[in-house]
Amino acid sequence: ALTTGWSRDDRDNLLVPTRGRYQRAFSEVGLPGLDLQYYRLNYQFQQFFPLFPRVTLAFNGEIGYGDGYSGDPYPFFKNYYVGGIGSVRGFETGSLGPRDVDDSPLGGNRRLNFSLEAYVPIPGADRTLRALTFVDAGQVWGLAPARDENGNFVIANGRPVYEDQRTDLGDLRYSVGIGVAWISPLGPLKLSYAYPLNRESQDRIQRFQFQIGTGF
């Protein structure tokens, strides 16, 4: 596959930014003549604002889209996954979106997620240890097992039939929460507690989550 990328970083600090913008775009294409002919397009946007003298407001948004071409299907192992730290906290990592007949997450070829966070330094600590509050939203769409009018899976030739989901912003999952972020000697650490706002019966919930690495 051919991959290309572009990024621009205007943040005032790479580890503890208080103002500025970060953008990243990425593409991946399975070239004609190869076994898999597909493409993936990704874009990430971050903006940081000094809300008050010691409070920073941060926005992160990500969008991704992939598909096959020349009659080839989009490879399932290139699917996007949403849920957990880095997308929608309060839900299990990678658990949102379509589920297979065995209830395992399938991911999808379309993703959208965004977060709004407010950071404030913890009193008595340096600026690398901060408390935060956040709002997350996101979802992933793709192929899902088809169901009949009774809600049963459609089976043909002994195998489930899959149909492409419609991209519906009404499917977005939302959560709010609090957490702590620390730029440790091992790298960025983040601990969060989230409350899902519009969980469905099939959603997998994980309120406490921990992450090492990546700022958002």
Walk through the language-model features, giving the residues of each.
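Short glycine-rich, acidic/polar surface loops and turns
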Residues: 117-119, 167, 173-181
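Exposed loop/turn and edge beta-strand positions of beta-sandwich/beta-sheet ligand-binding modules
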Residues: 39, 174, 206
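A short, acidic, flexible beta-alpha connecting loop/helix-capping segment that sits on the rim
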Residues: 195-199
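C-terminal outer-membrane beta-barrel translocator/porin domains of Gram-negative envelope proteins
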Residues: 1-129, 133-162, 202, 210-215
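Short amphipathic alpha-helical interaction segments
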Residues: 104, 108, 164, 168-172, ...
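Glycine-centered small-residue hotspots that permit tight backbone geometry or close packing
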Residues: 84, 90, 159, 173-179, ...
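Outer-membrane beta-barrel "beta-signal"
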Residues: 3, 180-189, 205-216
